[in-house]
Amino acid sequence: MRSAQSKRSQSTATGERTLHIGRDRPIRISAGHRLQHHDGKCSRPHGHNYEISVEITGQLTDEGWVVDKGTVTAVVSDWDHRFLLEDGDPLVDAFREAGDGDAVVVLEQPPTAEVMGVVLERKLHDALPETVSAVSVTVAETPALTAGPN
């Protein structure tokens, strides 16, 4: 019996695990954006109190975790109190000319919740150790609009 428990402990320590950050208490950031080519009110500058949750799968590190939560929150928090704009939006230059260029995050695509999730997944994957095999991000823009993996 003891050897079976020992083998089970070894497989847990060496197998992949998933870390859930923000599942019950999301990471909250406030950010502005606009959808430049939208026909409705979303083309105007506005903001949201985003709620973000992250799932990270990977091997346990020597420290006994998949990743340090502080690394994840630092990447996400980099967008807190920033304005997200699509590359080519004239507001990018307006922010820079006003001396607020550091307040802008320029994305290659429109700053929708879906795009935000994909970009944050890439940024996290780049910032995390090679022991990480998968990163998924869910972004809630409003209680009625949440984007994440299938």
Swiss-Prot record:
InterPro entries: 6-PTP_synth/QueD (IPR007115), 6-PTP_synth/QueD_sf (IPR038418). Residues 1-22 are annotated as: Disordered. Its EC number is 4.1.2.50. This is Probable 6-carboxy-5,6,7,8-tetrahydropterin synthase. The active site is at 42 (proton acceptor), 81 (charge relay system), 141 (charge relay system). Belongs to the PTPS family. QueD subfamily. Gene3D superfamilies: 6-pyruvoyl tetrahydropterin synthase/QueD. It catalyses: 7,8-dihydroneopterin 3'-triphosphate + H2O = 6-carboxy-5,6,7,8-tetrahydropterin + triphosphate + acetaldehyde + 2 H(+). It comes from Halobacterium salinarum (strain ATCC 29341 / DSM 671 / R1). GO terms for molecular function: 6-carboxytetrahydropterin synthase activity; metal ion binding.
